Amino acid sequence: MNIVLFEASELTSDHKITLADRRYAHLRDVLKCVEGDRVRVGMINGAKGTGQILSMTTATVDLHVEINEAPLPCHPTTLVLALPRPKMLRRILRSCAEFGVQDIHIIHSYRVEKSFWQSPLLEPKKIRQALLVGLERSG
């Protein structure tokens, strides 16, 4: 994770966010952050900046967020993709988000197994999650 992404609804009026999910676990276990450290943050569908760790408990981390950078533009690229195996689709979606692909169209073709269309990965929530993981890696 090269950037901590958050929803606008998570940001309080005093520019703070509290994390208690996988983002918190990553900051604690992988990055080994401590109070006072700065991390890159970005608002989903918004700008990016830095966040300073105010406090860390055994369950949450509080960040003070300063948004001061414009978001990177998307590449004007459209990907037309015959539905691959579900495991590969997750990887492809992550990579597309990392590279800033603007549009992704998933289509059926002669060689696509019909059972692939029943995959839970095609649920909007799962697609969004795969794209967010890619965005977090892109930084």
Predicted region positions:
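N-terminal positively charged helical leader segments and presequences
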Residues: 1-69
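RNA substrate-binding interface of SAM-dependent RNA methyltransferases
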Residues: 71-139
